[in-house]
């Protein structure tokens, strides 16, 4: 996907007084800004647009008269109000007593003149939103509307070619093999680079997924690179999604995470992978979870800690809390004894506070409640079987700070793709995160948190706030499937598992379309169930 917004600056306007936009009316003579003529040309030609970027002093737009008719334009924003109206309404435009346009009750000092031709008019207000129309309000009363043209649906998703130096498959999760990676994206689906190549090391990754025929991989480049306009780093992952026959559950969960606003959401894109010349299907290429300034941005050297909750207990330092939560040090992976003692005491104190008779007065000093609420929403909405503080959960603890659910990970057996909940309910029904803790039903952190009326009130308020954004996820899923084009068909030619049970599928269908339809059906039903139940708490 082409990068949609490089910078999100909501306001590019010079304010010199509380009642007007722009400079003093005494010396300001309205005129068309530099670059506006190309916007006029694009509007007259009926062009849509595919890319937009905003800086403090200009707007740059890639218009599209069609797939093969690129037309770019850049315009100065001097004396123009511009805002991102995602999730909000544009400001009201009106005319003041002097006959000048006002935006949101503030005068622009630009006269309204309906006699002006579009070619003579002056822009004074611009609104935009991701994936929506771009609107330019001009002084003759017209609004130039440019439809969003989504070129992500054209062409093929990127191809990733992995070649090991020994030309053999990858059999180990511990030992890296050396080799080369080549990424080809001639259709510019997700970045402007057509081809990237580098030397690398590669090994297997994952727990249960490593035991499946289609293997997931961990890649470490010899030099840092900013792949697919993600973070600049050496370490990357290829998720196989073997048991997720929709191929988009992890992608969908990260989109929900992005909308909820977690401190970090791992970026992911779908790709097709070739290993030593053999086609291996559709994978999800993503940022590896790690501490860095562009990923988990904490200061380990200063005493901050990244923890993982994981029953596998496969890190160097692991322990179970007094209430049965399986903790591990993720970074630092070899903590000092002082850090170990501090961490164990912190969780002991937190759980003691949480199970205290007057817990509502004390537990909040240990946790960042907002992140715990968002974690509950995404894990409960997806009914992620691993999300009940049992596996693949990540928390940060800043020195002298509060415990934060920093990011989420691993959703391939969520959203109707699990058959072992053990609650006897359909996958879109029943509480999971709220009631089913890591140490059994009615015994976990969230079970106690929901005994606090204030916590419940905050959950309900947050749910009402994000519910409209969650309602549009099905359309996002359908778009993501369209972006992949014919790649899923090739994937299931390589892996002939449609119509066959793969652990832990709740439902087995006979086509890719039916797999996507099941994901959409389950998500829609779960969202409706959640909305009813959360508001009734």
Question: Which residues fall in each region the model found?
Answer:
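Conserved NTP-binding catalytic cores of kinases and kinase-like/nucleotidyltransferase enzymes
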Residues: 150-248, 252
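Sec-dependent signal peptide recognition
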Residues: 2-10
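A conserved helix-loop-beta module that forms one wall/lid of the active-site cleft
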Residues: 242-276
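Middle-to-C-terminal accessory/interaction subdomains
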Residues: 168-170, 196, 208, 212, ...
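Internal "kinase-insert"/substrate-recognition segments embedded within catalytic cores
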Residues: 220-226, 240-241, 261-266, 278-377
């Amino acid at each position: 996907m082409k990068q949609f917004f490089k910078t999100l600056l909501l306001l590019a306007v010079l304010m010199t007084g509380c009642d007007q936009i722009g400079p003093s009316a005494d010396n300001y003579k309205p005129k068309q800004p530099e670059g506006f003529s190309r916007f006029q040309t694009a509007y007259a030609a009926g062009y849509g647009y595919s890319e937009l970027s905003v800086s403090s002093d200009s707007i740059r737009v890639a218009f599209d008269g069609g797939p093969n008719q690129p037309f770019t334009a850049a315009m100065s924003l001097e004396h123009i109000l511009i805002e991102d109206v995602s999730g909000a309404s544009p400001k009201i435009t009106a005319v003041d007593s002097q006959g000048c346009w006002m935006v949101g009750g503030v005068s622009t000092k630009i006269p309204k003149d309906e006699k002006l031709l579009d070619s003579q008019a002056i822009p004074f207000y611009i609104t935009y939103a991701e994936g929506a129309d771009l609107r330019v309000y001009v002084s003759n009363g017209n609004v130039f509307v440019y439809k969003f043209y989504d070129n992500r649906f054209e062409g093929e998703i990127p191809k990733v070619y992995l070649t090991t130096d020994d030309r053999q498959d990858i059999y180990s999760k511990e030992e890296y093999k050396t080799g080369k990676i080549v990424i080809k994206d001639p259709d510019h689906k997700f970045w402007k680079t057509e081809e990237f190549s580098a030397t690398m090391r590669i090994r297997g990754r994952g727990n249960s997924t490593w035991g499946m025929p289609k293997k997931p991989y961990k890649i470490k480049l010899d030099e840092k690179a900013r792949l697919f306009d993600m973070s600049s780093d050496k370490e990357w992952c290829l998720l196989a999604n073997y048991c997720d026959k929709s191929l988009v559950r992890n992608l969908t969960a990260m989109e929900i995470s992005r909308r909820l606003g977690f401190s970090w959401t791992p970026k992911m894109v779908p790709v097709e992978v070739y290993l030593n010349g053999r086609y291996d299907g559709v994978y999800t290429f993503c940022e590896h979870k790690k501490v860095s300034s562009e990923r988990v941005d904490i200061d380990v050297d200063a005493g901050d800690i990244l923890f993982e909750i994981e029953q596998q207990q496969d890190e160097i330092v692991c322990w179970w809390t007094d209430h049965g939560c399986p903790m591990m040090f993720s970074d630092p992976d070899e903590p000092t004894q002082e850090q170990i003692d501090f961490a164990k005491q912190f969780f002991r104190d937190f759980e003691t506070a949480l199970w205290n008779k007057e817990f509502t007065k004390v537990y909040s000093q240990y946790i960042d409640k907002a992140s715990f609420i968002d974690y509950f929403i995404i894990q409960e909405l997806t009914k992620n079987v691993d999300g009940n503080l049992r596996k693949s959960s990540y928390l940060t603890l800043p020195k002298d700070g509060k415990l934060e659910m920093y990011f989420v990970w691993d959703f391939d057996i969520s959203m109707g793709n699990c058959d072992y909940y053990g609650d006897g309910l359909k996958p879109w029904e029943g509480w999971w995160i709220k009631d089913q803790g890591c140490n059994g039903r009615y015994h976990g952190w969230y079970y106690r948190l929901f005994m606090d009326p204030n916590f419940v009130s905050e959950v309900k308020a947050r749910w009402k706030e994000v519910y409209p954004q969650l309602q549009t996820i099905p359309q996002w899923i359908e778009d993501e499937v369209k972006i992949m084009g014919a790649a899923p068909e090739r994937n299931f030619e390589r892996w002939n598992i449609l119509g066959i049970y793969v652990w832990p599928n709740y439902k087995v269908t006979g086509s890719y379309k039916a797999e996507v339809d099941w994901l959409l059906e389950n998500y829609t039903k779960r969202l409706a169930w959640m909305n009813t139940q959360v508001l009734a708490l």
